[in-house]
């Protein structure tokens, strides 16, 4: 669960964290017995625990298809991200990856830790892929082909303009949105969403990741990964790596805020996409990552720590998002709360303040007009959660132990 300090500071994180831990244990027990499927679901939980939990709620056939889709694209991403692979080797692999998924003898050793295991044992993913229905296989092959070609293009091309940035994000994430929409439609659970809305779902997530991961990407060895567009960062510094130096802190934060403001462009499309979903499990699967993204942007905005270390939502807040997100009203409430948090951090002296505030106010207007912002709802913004004395701490841990014992025996399927 979360760290002791974080739990004591945010005691209402206890119950969601407890439910999340129990759900994780339950998900691990549901791993299939067939070797290739056992590998795939075990690997899914290793590379993304939260994604692994949400995916478990989907229907069996769709769950299998989304699991394989995710692992195939993680493998493709592992090849792209490994800066030790020469361009001459990397580009042909990316271009041919959609054919490799049909070959259960193919593997390519690269990446580190669990990603290296995924690549070394890729035949398990291929075998599971071949088990899928034809509609699922066709959708996965098509997106893998297009993504591999797009990644190959940007191996040899820098992200210069905002149009380049949008194009790169389309290849690595917008296509994921298109692919998931195709899988949802193939399952019979949803109408086929437009490419434009599907693309925005992916771009919002990807741009958030690119913003949050600046320091990790710029410090990559043997070669930096640079995804922030020159058109934005060149307004503030001469070289992208200059943003991490303390003497450029003021300019770095202004550049960061410019990047966040750009990402906010996609929120209205994302809200429209989610409001059109009918299946409750698919809805949760799509909505939880989007809320995590707006929450992460709220943390990153105007925060110099993006250039100093890791900025991410605490585990307890993540658990709350997973626990509370069930309906579109919950989504509107979360986006309103996090946009309020972000708005409170806007400095009127920031060069993009007017643009940032305009985009946040447009998001807040949509949320207000939805009618979802009732006084009874639970807010993600709590003014004061500190000041608990030692007696209360002891009581809270007793309650925690009782809840854990109760939920372990009575709520194995809850999140």
Swiss-Prot record:
Membrane-spanning residues where? 281-301, 392-412
Name one process (GO BP) from the record. Answer: isoprenoid biosynthetic process
- Which cellular components does GO assign to this protein? endoplasmic reticulum membrane
* Pathway(s) the chain acts in: Terpene metabolism; lanosterol biosynthesis; lanosterol from farnesyl diphosphate: step 1/3
Question: What's the catalysed reaction?
Answer: 2 (2E,6E)-farnesyl diphosphate + NADH + H(+) = squalene + 2 diphosphate + NAD(+); 2 (2E,6E)-farnesyl diphosphate + NADPH + H(+) = squalene + 2 diphosphate + NADP(+)
Query: Which CDD domains does this entry report, sorted A to Z?
Result: Trans_IPPS_HH (cd00683)
User: Where is this gene product found?
Assistant: Endoplasmic reticulum membrane
Pfam families, A to Z: SQS_PSY
SUPFAM superfamilies found in the cross-reference section: Terpenoid synthases
For molecular function, the Gene Ontology terms on record are: squalene synthase [NAD(P)H] activity
Query: InterPro entries recorded for this chain?
Result: Isoprenoid_synthase_dom_sf, Squ/phyt_synthse, Squal_synth-like, Squalene/phytoene_synthase_CS, Trans_IPPS_euk-type, Trans_IPPS_HH
Query: Cofactor(s) for this protein?
Result: Mg(2+); Mn(2+)
**Keyword vocabulary terms for this entry:** Endoplasmic reticulum, Isoprene biosynthesis, Membrane, Transferase, Transmembrane, Transmembrane helix
> Which topology term describes how it sits in the membrane?
Multi-pass membrane protein
**What EC numbers are recorded for this enzyme?**
2.5.1.21
NCBIfam families xrefs: squal_synth
- Protein purpose: Component of the triterpene saponins (e.g. ginsenosides or panaxosides) and phytosterols biosynthetic pathways. Catalyzes the biosynthesis of squalene.
The family classification in the record reads: Belongs to the phytoene/squalene synthase family.
Put simply, this protein is called Squalene synthase 2
